[in-house]
Each structure stands twice: as structure tokens, then as C-alpha cells.
């Protein structure tokens, strides 16, 4: 609160709802999400902490520009009250970054999106629009999924 970084929500206070999700980056280039409400400060030692305030960018005039995930959530009307949205943004951002480092076959995409967002709880709208928005960003971003062409072993 002293830094005016109030976007990370304190909801359940037990790490269950994931509204307080943040991203920790380590020196090796890896990243993982964690619920801020139950993650001790000592665990962050040697890691960089990213909160929802650090996800959007800025244009040359200094105006805030939503990230691809944030814009997709807006475009898909993914949220209603938006209390849980910071946690969903952080989870989806970590997923997109992970796929940028290690793309997956397209056939695994749905399961991977569900796994990434599965711990986040929304009490208003459900999850379909969140999932659709993340899918749209991933499929629109080159290099995140691999189209695997099945070959017939009987040929050639």
C-alpha cells in the first residue's frame, strides 16, 4: 500500500482462490506463479517479483497499454466484478511466457490452459471466457504452439 501497488487482491487469505497471484522470476530465466497471501518473503530471496501493476506497457506518450492477455480479457468480456482478474492475468501471463520458452503441440493446448488457470476461482462469470481469451492470445502469437502433422508409417 505504501508503494500504491494495490492490484494484488487479498481475498481468501489462504492461497486457495489465487486472486493474489504474483509471478516470481529467477536468475535462470524461469518463472512461476505463487499466491502472495501465503508466500513468505524469504522464499522470494534471489527472485524478482512481478505484480499485476507490472504487466501492462506504456506507449510513447506514456499512456498505459494493456498486455495481450489483459486486452483479450477485455475483448472477450471475461470478467464481471474483476476482483479475481489480477490472478487470472498473472496465471495466463506466466503460461504465455512459458510457452515462449517451450512451445507445446497444439493438441495439448486446451489441457495446458486449463491446468494454468485451474486454481483461480471466479465467483461471477465462470471460466469459459477466460479460457477463450487465453486461447486466442496463444494461437495469435507465433511460436507458442507447434502444429504436429501426423505421418502415416506405411508411406515411404
Identify the meaning behind each predicted range.
Residues 1-156:
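Signature of N-terminal electron-transfer/Fe-S-associated modules in redox systems
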Amino acid at each position: 500500500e505504501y508503494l500504491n501497488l494495490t492490484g494484488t487482491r487479498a481475498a481468501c487469505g489462504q492461497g486457495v482462490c489465487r486472486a493474489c497471484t504474483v509471478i516470481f522470476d529467477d536468475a535462470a530465466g524461469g518463472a512461476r506463479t505463487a499466491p502472495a497471501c501465503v508466500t513468505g518473503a524469504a522464499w522470494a530471496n534471489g527472485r524478482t517479483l512481478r505484480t499485476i501493476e507490472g504487466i501492462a506497457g506504456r506507449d510513447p506518450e506514456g499512456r498505459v497499454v494493456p498486455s495481450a492477455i489483459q486486452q483479450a480479457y477485455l475483448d472477450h468480456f471475461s470478467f464481471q466484478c474483476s476482483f479475481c482478474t489480477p490472478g487470472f492475468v498473472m496465471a495466463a501471463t506466466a503460461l504465455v511466457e512459458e510457452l515462449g520458452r517451450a512451445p507445446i503441440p497444439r493438441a495439448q493446448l486446451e489441457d495446458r490452459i486449463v491446468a494454468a488457470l485451474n486454481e483461480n476461482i471466479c465467483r461471477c462469470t465462470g471460466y469459459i471466457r477466460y479460457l477463450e481469451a487465453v486461447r486466442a492470445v496463444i494461437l495469435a502469437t507465433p511460436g507458442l504452439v507447434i502444429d504436429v502433422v501426423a505421418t502415416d508409417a506405411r508411406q515411404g
